[in-house]
Curated annotation (Swiss-Prot):
Name this polypeptide is given: Tyrosine-binding protein
Inactivation phenotype: C.difficile isolates lacking CDR20291_0805 and CDR20291_0806 show reduced uptake of tyrosine. Production of the tyrosine catabolic end product p-cresol is decreased by sixfold, and the intermediate fermentation product (4-hydroxyphenyl)acetate is not detectable at all.
Compartment list: Cell membrane
GO cellular component: plasma membrane
Main location: membrane
Coiled coil: none
Amino acid sequence: MIKSKKILSLIIAGVLGVSMLTGCSQNDGSNASNENKKTDSKKQKNIGISQLVEHPSLDKAKKGFIKALEDKGYKDGDNIKIDFQNAQNDMPTTQSIASKFVSDKKDLIYAISTPSAQAAYNATKDIPIIMTAVTDPVEAGLVKSLEKPGGNVSGTSDYLSIDKTLELVKTLTPKAKKIGVIYNTSEVNSKIQVDSLHDYAKKNNYEVVEKGISTSSEVNQAISSLVGKIDVLYVPTDNLIVSSMPIVSKVANENKIPIIASEEGSVSSGALACCGIDYEKLGYKAGELAIEVLEGKSVGDIPVTTLDETEIIINEDTLKALDMQKLSADNIKYIKSDENAKSAK
């Protein structure tokens, strides 16, 4: 009997031991699962940046985006990996870049300019896209509305009422009657701004003389063809024209044609003045929206953002070259031409 009790005790102890081992094994599995989840949440995110062309405004939009990420602890080479690609102002290349980002399975695409954003959107409806420097995202077919984008695109728009810019024509060139404009016929945002220019001109008794081009090799001929036909030149946020501003400003300034531009980069490249926004701030805001997406928010639920704050910027060197006087207003920022503009003169 005693022997039987001992055997029974050993059996019970064995069963309990196996149960404890099984429990430990299950706990270890659960802990491992939790650790895997933690690892997944800290997994390095891959971000593709597609920029149409290098010029000051788009470069600032890129800089602001990266700074916003860094300010929130997202460091390239650490918890994020940034793949930057520049299309060198070639539209087919924007498509190639977007397709490569999709095949690489990027976690997010940052598209700088309307063509870059359109290329990304055409390539994927799954990967979230944060755009910037897009004048009219709705007209470009990127979002359903600014308030409720839907789909996989949101970001920041550089839309600014053309009235603010063209009021500078009245202020700086009060005798002007003919406004010239050169623009890339392939850029949707440029067409929108030229249409707005025509609307403004009708309301304010100006005549518009336009010249549409499609490649940078046509810029010199286009601006030269307007000499003697216009009193002032308007430059929209057109990436082809803005990236060629040293050429445009050289011809215009030599022929005493004031240039009213749409952003500071053009003014630093020789244009007379602009009423524009800060593209680094625009890019920074886009970076903040990207962080929301990286942390789980649906990009289609994030409203498209614009900047309300503007400033008037005047190029002192160009002012002198055109034999014009400084304005007495306090809210004006005066700058000098950059080295590229000076070397083109």
